[in-house]
A protein has these predicted regions:
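HotDog/MaoC-like acyl-thioester-processing domains
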Residues: 6-8, 12-17, 79-81, 88-122
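Catalytic strand-loop segment that frames the active site of acyl-thioester-processing enzymes
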Residues: 2-42
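Hydrophobic beta-strand-centered segment that forms part of the acyl-chain substrate-binding groove
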Residues: 52-86
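Secondary-structure boundary/capping signal
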Residues: 18, 59-63, 109
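Generic helix-packing signal
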Residues: 24, 59, 105-107
Length: 122
């Protein structure tokens, strides 16, 4: 699983909230093929995975994405950006958790994701 570890550092963590960083570098393989308007852009699927991994760290367990309630991109995330991810647990029922994740770069909102995950049964 280490080859898919996308979270670089956890800055703060409580029982219901976590703040973490993803340093976006040109060396990431996704930039070879994801060019928009002659500019490498971090794919939304990778951003979704980063936010999901931050959620897993918050919950302290491996989860599976059950539902994307909403996802909105406000700005492109490009090499050199430091994506600050804040994930908040909104509600938990058993092994099902509703979360919201917000990604910012230099204080400017890049993405917001409302999602539901299910804990691994093992």
């Amino acid at each position: 699983m280490d080859q898919m570890k996308l979270v670089d550092r956890v800055l703060d963590k409580s029982s219901n909230k976590i703040i973490a960083l993803k340093n976006v570098t040109i060396n990431e393989p996704c930039f070879r093929d994801h060019i928009i308007d002659n500019e490498p852009v971090l794919p939304g699927s990778i951003i979704l995975e980063v936010i999901g991994q931050v959620g897993d760290i918050l919950l302290g367990t491996v989860t599976y994405l059950a539902k994307v309630d909403s996802m909105r991109f406000y700005e492109k995330t490009i090499p050199g950006d430091q994506l600050k991810i804040e994930v908040v647990k909104l509600k938990s029922i058993g092994k099902i958790h509703k979360l919201i994740g917000v990604g910012t770069v230099d204080g400017k909102r890049h993405v917001e994701l409302k999602f539901t995950v299910r804990e691994d049964d093992e």
